[in-house]
């Protein structure tokens, strides 16, 4: 959303709803079939709205589909802006900039890394459960043991 301007935050939410519903209902472009609008950020002066979007793609074809979807969004930018202006009732409608949202893809990568780390932790826990100490379980001398040894030496000397 926007920084500190509550009006910009409200307009960003409105733009997100209008753009998402328009892509789904009014734009009959196959390139936009699997588009999801994830977030909209509006500048505090309400001049520019960055529309972040993501796309569910088929393995191996994501890059090409993403480029085609970006082209379709750029072509529909004027129509979407006029719809936003009409539904929002704004004197000046923000300029729409469509930006591909990298966060979901990065989130999947992080989840994969965490899954590998969890698997390693489980394996380490299994190894640790059957592990034995190389020497004594507690190799350090404690004060009560040192005193007992000291008493033995004193009794030998007497």
UniProtKB/Swiss-Prot annotation:
Q: What GO molecular function annotation could you give as one example from this UniProt entry?
A: ribosomal small subunit binding
Q: Does the keyword Cell cycle apply?
A: no
| One cellular component (GO) term of this entry | cytosol
The record's subcellular locations are: Cytoplasm
Which keywords describe this protein according to UniProt?
Cytoplasm, Ribosome biogenesis
Q: What is its main location?
A: cytoplasm
Task: Enumerate the residue ranges of region (Disordered).
Answer: 130-158
Q: Looking at the keywords, is Cytoplasm present?
A: yes
Q: Where is the composition biased (Acidic residues)?
A: 145-158
Gene Ontology BP term (one) = maturation of SSU-rRNA
Superkingdom classification of source: Bacteria
In terms of PANTHER family, this protein maps to: RIBOSOME-BINDING FACTOR A, CHLOROPLASTIC-RELATED
Q: Assembly state and interactors? A: Monomer. Binds 30S ribosomal subunits, but not 50S ribosomal subunits or 70S ribosomes.
Role description: One of several proteins that assist in the late maturation steps of the functional core of the 30S ribosomal subunit. Associates with free 30S ribosomal subunits (but not with 30S subunits that are part of 70S ribosomes or polysomes). Required for efficient processing of 16S rRNA. May interact with the 5'-terminal helix region of 16S rRNA.
Can you tell me which family this protein belongs to? Belongs to the RbfA family.
Q: What name appears for this protein in its UniProt entry?
A: Ribosome-binding factor A
Organism of origin is Bifidobacterium longum subsp. infantis (strain ATCC 15697 / DSM 20088 / JCM 1222 / NCTC 11817 / S12)
Name of the gene encoding the protein in the UniProt record: rbfA
């Amino acid at each position: 959303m926007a920084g500190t301007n509550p009006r910009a935050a409200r307009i960003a939410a409105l733009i997100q709803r209008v753009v998402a519903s328009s892509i789904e209902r009014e734009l009959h472009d196959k390139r936009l079939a699997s588009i999801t609008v994830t977030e909209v950020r509006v500048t505090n002066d309400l001049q520019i709205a960055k529309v972040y979007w993501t796309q569910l793609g088929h393995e191996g074809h994501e890059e090409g589909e993403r480029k085609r979807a970006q082209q379709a969004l750029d072509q529909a930018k004027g129509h979407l802006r006029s719809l936003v202006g009409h539904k929002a009732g704004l004197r000046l409608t923000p300029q729409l900039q469509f930006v591909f949202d990298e966060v979901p893809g990065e989130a999947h990568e992080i989840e994969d890394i965490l899954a590998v780390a969890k698997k390693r932790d489980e394996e380490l826990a299994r190894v640790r459960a059957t592990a034995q100490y190389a020497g004594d379980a507690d190799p350090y001398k404690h004060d009560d043991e040192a005193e007992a040894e000291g008493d033995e030496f004193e009794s030998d000397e007497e």
